[in-house]
Amino acid sequence: MSSVQLSRGDFHSIFTNKQRYDNPTGGVYQVYNTRKSDGANSNRKNLIMISDGIYHMKALLRNQAASKFQSMELQRGDIIRVIIAEPAIVRERKKYVLLVDDFELVQSRADMVNQTSTFLDNYFSEHPNETLKDEDITDSGNVANQTNASNAGVPDMLHSNSNLNANERKFANENPNSQKTRPIFAIEQLSPYQNVWTIKARVSYKGEIKTWHNQRGDGKLFNVNFLDTSGEIRATAFNDFATKFNEILQEGKVYYVSKAKLQPAKPQFTNLTHPYELNLDRDTVIEECFDESNVPKTHFNFIKLDAIQNQEVNSNVDVLGIIQTINPHFELTSRAGKKFDRRDITIVDDSGFSISVGLWNQQALDFNLPEGSVAAIKGVRVTDFGGKSLSMGFSSTLIPNPEIPEAYALKGWYDSKGRNANFITLKQEPGMGGQSAASLTKFIAQRITIARAQAENLGRSEKGDFFSVKAAISFLKVDNFAYPACSNENCNKKVLEQPDGTWRCEKCDTNNARPNWRYILTISIIDETNQLWLTLFDDQAKQLLGVDANTLMSLKEEDPNEFTKITQSIQMNEYDFRIRAREDTYNDQSRIRYTVANLHSLNYRAEADYLADELSKALLA
């Protein structure tokens, strides 16, 4: 039995008594249930259920509280005392949450005090008149600095109180007068559970206004990224608000931003890791801030160029390199007939690797940096067609000669050692079995056997594992080797055939006359130790078979002999495979799924040279 008295009925008091709402600390509660929250910040926050003996409610553990909870491995029955917290009411959804920043453990593994306690959300749903009203918990400071009457009203969702944690106090102290008028939050703290907040942030990226037209009508949107010392968050405005905020916001300047709506981020449209993004609308308030202290100009998570070979295709990375070569710009035409300008540059770094970076449209035309310049590239996309390369996207940023320590160090290395160095390229080159000799030597040395990959359980780490094998293709599945994809530019979603013979894409909300077939090919490979099933997606399958999926699908229907000839031509041929292993769970069954990240035919001269070198080393040992 528990010898500790819980703060019985305290949750009801917090949300019905103004004095308790303003100071909701010191309560003693029991852990009622636990579960990890979803999202990119799940390692920082835990959503749990706590009980005061009469009611139970949700608690979101943040910062120190989240770290403590995980390190102590707290579980149902443990009793805690809350040290720092603030309540929040999400009025639209009738949710009541306690945001806990710190607590202490009072008793472990206590018996449950009341397993039939009332869920607080349900109680207040039945007794809505008992809770504090907006005017009771929204002081004048929280609605100050409004510029017109339409913005002066209380927002739809009731605000949390303005108790600040340590990180938030650091931001508020940058402006001594702001603490009474606005709670300054760190960007990493933003979530739908905070409803009165202001961030002080720099516009680290500003996109152009984009327009669209479909069956539902016309529209336009505008994107910016906001940056502070804790992280970055994407913001989007639509239609008239896109025009309004495009005129207000300038890249590089610092602003106070408040009253924007928080919604889950869409990873396919952003290179940031924040689990939420801002929607700038009629209620959003943005004021320029002339105190830029403690607001960084940019934030990077650099990786070395040699690590790009292990990155997922279509992932976004930050890189720092020296511009080694600059190619002339040229023109490309898409399947839809749209023309694009492109320029390729090559960057190198002190990992000994080089990689191609594709610039597009106006950036490709205007590029004028000299060779030997330092380039910091943020949010550049990893591609894999004929080897790994990088491609600038709509929100990628290239900063020339940035004034950061890493850039000075890299420039010093290049001037003293790197200018005349030989670099390994990740781009495949004709005539060398797909790669340079130096690159092939490195890949040959990295090989392991299939049996070793299976014995070491590669793929069970959180992000999966990469490994290389030399193996022969023993079988190719010719059924369901491709899927019908949308034929619109930059859309690969599966389409469904309609009764009228057209193919519909729900994402684009369009019907097209024919699909664009894309590979999802399954093969079996063998080496001297074991067998493995692999999946190849479109780029890798085209490289293996030498034809695209549209062509092979036509041959299957119109020329079965040629179809068989192509599919059998690769069987029992040896290749070098770069494989990504990752654990998959389906119907509560876990298994390792293997996909091909890269492949190339064997270069027997390089193989012989490598074996000769290894024999020489063994003889000299």
UniProtKB/Swiss-Prot annotation:
List the Gene3D superfamilies: Nucleic acid-binding proteins
Q: Which residues carry this modification: N-acetylserine?
A: 2
Q: Name one GO molecular function term.
A: double-stranded DNA binding
What does the record note on quaternary structure?
Component of the heterotrimeric canonical replication protein A complex (RPA). Interacts with POB3.
Q: What else is known?
A: Present with 4100 molecules/cell in log phase SD medium.
What name does the UniProt record give this protein? Answer: Replication factor A protein 1
A Pfam family recorded for this sequence: tRNA_anti-codon
Species lineage: Eukaryota, Fungi, Dikarya, Ascomycota, Saccharomycotina
Give the protein's biological function.
As part of the replication protein A (RPA/RP-A), a single-stranded DNA-binding heterotrimeric complex, may play an essential role in DNA replication, recombination and repair. Binds and stabilizes single-stranded DNA intermediates, preventing complementary DNA reannealing and recruiting different proteins involved in DNA metabolism. Binds to single-stranded sequences participating in DNA replication in addition to those mediating transcriptional repression (URS1) and activation (CAR1). Stimulates the activity of a cognate strand exchange protein (SEP1).
Alphabetized, the UniProt keywords read: Acetylation, DNA replication, DNA-binding, Metal-binding, Nucleus, Phosphoprotein, Zinc, Zinc-finger
Q: What organism does the record attribute this protein to?
A: Saccharomyces cerevisiae (strain ATCC 204508 / S288c) (Baker's yeast)
Q: Which GO terms describe its biological process?
A: DNA repair; DNA replication; DNA topological change; double-strand break repair via homologous recombination; establishment of protein localization; heteroduplex formation; meiotic cell cycle; mitotic recombination
One GO term of the cellular component aspect? Answer: DNA replication factor A complex
Localization per record: Nucleus
Please report which protein family the annotation says this sequence is part of.
Belongs to the replication factor A protein 1 family.
Q: Which residues bind DNA?
A: 197-284
User: What superkingdom does the record give?
Assistant: Eukaryota
In terms of SUPFAM superfamilies, this protein maps to: Nucleic acid-binding proteins
Q: What does the PTM comment of the record read?
A: The N-terminus is blocked.
Residues with the modification Phosphoserine, per the entry, are 178
Q: Zinc finger, C4-type: residue spans?
A: 486-508
